[in-house]
Swiss-Prot record:
It comes from Chlorobaculum tepidum (strain ATCC 49652 / DSM 12025 / NBRC 103806 / TLS) (Chlorobium tepidum). One of its GO terms (molecular function) is structural constituent of ribosome. Residues 114-129 have a biased composition (Basic residues). Disulfide bonds: none annotated. PROSITE patterns: RIBOSOMAL_S9. Pfam families: Ribosomal_S9 (PF00380). GO terms for biological process: translation. InterPro entries: Ribosomal_Su5_D2-typ_SF, Ribosomal_uS9, Ribosomal_uS9_bac/plastid, Ribosomal_uS9_CS, Ribsml_uS5_D2-typ_fold_subgr. Belongs to the universal ribosomal protein uS9 family. Residues 108-129 are annotated as: Disordered. One of its GO terms (cellular component) is small ribosomal subunit. Keywords: Ribonucleoprotein, Ribosomal protein. This is Small ribosomal subunit protein uS9. SUPFAM superfamilies: Ribosomal protein S5 domain 2-like.
């Protein structure tokens, strides 16, 4: 029986659920290959950065369910979830992931729009005369 590690990662409004098991390096995101889902090379490398830092690219089969937000938030959520799964698999990997802040939940969220303003901080045009 295979051991499956289940973790969750969040970023902005995106939530990623990762199911990681020992395997050959097959990565599936929402039933699509990772290359098809994250077409942008930067977003794909950002999502898979914990595997690269831990040098475990071909050691695990990973199934990812991600929803909410856009691709940037989703790649950040996937990255955090994979990092947490790697630490759950082997606690010694934590030291390698720490310097790149891969285990830290990014707290930045979209600032809400305020009344009397055009956006969160932008004011309407002001005319003195």
């Amino acid at each position: 029986m295979k051991e499956v590690i289940d973790t969750v990662g969040r970023r902005k409004t995106s939530v990623a659920r990762v199911f990681m098991s020992p395997g050959k390096g097959k990565i599936v995101v929402n039933k699509l290959p990772v290359e098809e889902y994250f077409k942008d090379e930067f977003k794909r490398s950002q999502a898979l950065k914990p595997l690269a830092v831990a040098e475990k690219q071909n050691d695990f089969d990973i199934t990812i369910n991600v929803k909410g937000g856009g691709l940037t938030g989703q790649s950040g959520a996937v990255s955090l979830a994979i990092a947490r799964a790697l630490v759950e698999f082997d606690e010694s990997i934590r030291a390698a992931l720490r310097p790149d802040r891969l285990l830290t939940r990014d707290p930045r969220m979209v600032e809400r729009k305020k009344y009397g303003k055009k956006k969160a901080r932008k004011s309407f045009q002001f005319s003195k005369r």
